[in-house]
């Protein structure tokens, strides 16, 4: 059972979103009403978005947002009880599991882009990051050009690995590109010398470095390969459910509730090691809060 968010936050969101929720039930809303269950897809090591803590509970910034959505849906569907099923997903399985109906919401660190919107839908952007690479300081890898001829790792099924494959072809870098399944695995490859660099979203790299045995040994590139807006995934062509989810997100921003949730995960100590990531809210995300968008176009951010 998940920990409830503060009642003041829940009340603001539910009251604000209530007028638009659950009218003619179809698609996912009907499924939730009929089964009394909502299935949330989660990651295992996407700190601080969706991951296992030291008690083997799934926690994180994206999970808190998904629980807000779950609480609002439960209230508006007037369900005495709404069972939450947690289904693990990886970078490779998350889109298929949304598309085939196994998972209702994917609560993680997934980039919303125009290509993915052909398969799934996204709610309002909840974080904006950039694609960079992490390496050992001793290797002196500062730019993409410095990676020439090296073995690098990224995650299968991500925009990150697609981008580095494209850059490798464009620049003729002669990279040996390995595909890991999870973030912790990618970091371990650099830590143990199997790869010279790990290409991934910078916020995830900062989290991995901060939680490592020797954070002072690693550096994250100044070079940014792209802008990556994160969104909670849901099925395409399900306008009633998307309307519900979007309204919850919009009200979370409008009410200011997002500030407490953001601070909890990015500006305060987080489990399992009590590390403070100390990542202030970016100008790009503040812009989203002021003018909520679900755009998959990086230029919007």
Model-derived features: positions:
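A ligand-binding cleft/hinge motif common to bilobed small-molecule-binding domains
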Residues: 93, 107-118, 162-170, 188-226, ...
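Periplasmic-binding protein-like
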Residues: 44, 127-138, 202, 210-249, ...
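Extracytoplasmic small-molecule ligand-binding "clamshell" domains
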Residues: 23-105, 255
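Acidic, polar ligand-binding/catalytic clefts
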Residues: 67, 78-146, 286-299
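Bilobed "Venus flytrap"/periplasmic-binding protein-like clamshell domains
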Residues: 39-48, 58-75, 111, 129-183, ...
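Ligand-binding clefts/hinges and TM-proximal coupling segments of bilobed small-molecule sensing domains
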Residues: 23, 33, 159-178, 216-218, ...
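Short helix-initiation/N-cap motifs at beta->coil->alpha
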Residues: 25-26, 79-96, 139, 177-189, ...
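Extended ligand-binding regions for polar small-molecule ligands
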Residues: 23, 29, 67-72, 145, ...
């Amino acid at each position: 059972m998940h920990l409830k968010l503060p009642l003041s936050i829940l009340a603001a969101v539910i009251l604000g979103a209530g007028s638009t929720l659950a009218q003619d039930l179809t698609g996912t809303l009907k499924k939730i009403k009929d089964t009394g269950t909502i299935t949330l897809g989660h990651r295992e090591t996407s700190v601080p978005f969706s991951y296992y803590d030291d008690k083997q509970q799934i926690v994180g910034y994206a999970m808190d947002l998904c629980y807000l959505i779950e609480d609002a849906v439960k209230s508006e569907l007037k369900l005495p009880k709404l069972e939450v099923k947690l289904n693990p997903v990886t970078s490779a399985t998350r889109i298929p599991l949304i598309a085939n109906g196994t998972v209702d919401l994917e609560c993680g660190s997934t980039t919303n882009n125009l290509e993915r919107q052909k398969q799934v839908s996204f709610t309002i952007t909840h974080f904006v990051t950039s694609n960079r690479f992490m390496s050992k300081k001793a290797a002196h890898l500062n730019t993409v050009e410095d990676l020439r001829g090296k073995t690098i790792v990224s995650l299968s099924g991500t925009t990150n690995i697609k981008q580095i494959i494209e850059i490798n072809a464009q620049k003729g870098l002669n990279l040996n590109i390995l595909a890991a399944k999870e973030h912790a695995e990618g970091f371990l490859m650099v830590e143990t010398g199997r790869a010279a660099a790990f290409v991934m979203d910078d916020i995830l790299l900062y989290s991995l470095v901060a939680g490592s045995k020797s954070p002072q040994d690693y550096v994250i590139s100044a070079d940014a390969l792209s802008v990556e807006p994160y969104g909670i995934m849901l099925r395409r062509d399900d306008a009633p459910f998307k309307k519900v989810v979007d309204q919850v997100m919009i009200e979370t921003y409008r009410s200011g509730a997002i500030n407490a949730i953001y601070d909890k995960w990015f500006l305060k100590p987080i489990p399992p090691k009590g590390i403070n990531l100390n990542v202030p809210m970016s100008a790009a995300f503040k812009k989203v809060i002021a003018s909520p968008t679900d755009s998959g176009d990086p230029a919007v951010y």
